[in-house]
A protein has these predicted regions:
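Structured core elements
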Residues: 28, 87-89, 139
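Short, acidic Gly/Pro/Ser/Thr-rich loop/turn segments
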Residues: 1-4, 95-96, 162
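Charged, often glycine-rich, active-site loop that binds/positions anionic groups
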Residues: 38-52
Length: 187
């Protein structure tokens, strides 16, 4: 639904390879049973309901169904984290890009090597995994594209284990170098 660009994928592949060389067991793919389109729909509905709460017109039953789906997603993640310490996900579909506010957000696009992509694929898609379930997510820098643009990775951890994702980010930084300030900010 929101595949990352080739240059971002290359940075992730280098990161995963380095983790494997360090002795980590890496399982590729999302948890079995995770209905990504339904998760995105539920997250979008709950976010819209929250934003429009002052105009509560939507039937309460729809909110209850969405909340029930959120609890099912949370249970799926709990099961996943019984056999995995963390899950690594993209933060966005591209590396850094110029900000353009000349169009309404729904009409904005981002130029990528693969062509124009909807702006709204950039952030909301990947954050739904942690946000809908209410599990911790930490973002860490993992490298630069060929053009020198920064790429981050999202580290998800079990519910109430915020320290796990933060500690993994610190260990990852030790292994792959962590944040590198742009030349104009390096001292």
């Amino acid at each position: 639904m929101a595949p990352v660009t080739a240059d971002v994928a290359a940075v992730y592949e280098r990161t995963v390879s380095e983790l494997e060389r360090a002795g980590s067991t890496v399982t590729r793919g999302l948890p079995a049973g995770l209905d990504v389109p339904a998760q995105l729909e539920t997250f979008s509905f709950l976010l819209t309901a929250m934003v429009n709460a002052q105009n509560v017109v939507d039937p309460h039953i729809r909110w209850l169904q969405a909340s029930q789906h959120r609890l099912a997603v949370r249970a799926l993640w709990q099961s996943y984290f019984e056999s995995h310490d963390v899950l690594l996900l993209p933060t966005t579909i591209t590396a850094a890009f110029p900000h353009d506010h000349s169009e309404p957000i729904g009409k904005r696009t981002i130029d990528t090597p693969e062509g124009k992509r909807p702006y709204l694929q950039q952030v909301p898609y990947w954050i739904t995994f942690a946000s809908l379930a209410g599990i911790p997510a930490t973002v860490a820098p993992v490298g630069l594209t060929r053009d020198g643009l920064p790429v981050g990775i999202q580290i998800l951890a079990p519910m109430w284990e915020d320290a796990t994702s933060i500690e993994f980010a610190a260990l990852l930084a030790e292994r792959i170098g962590g944040f590198t300030p742009p030349p104009q900010f390096a001292s």
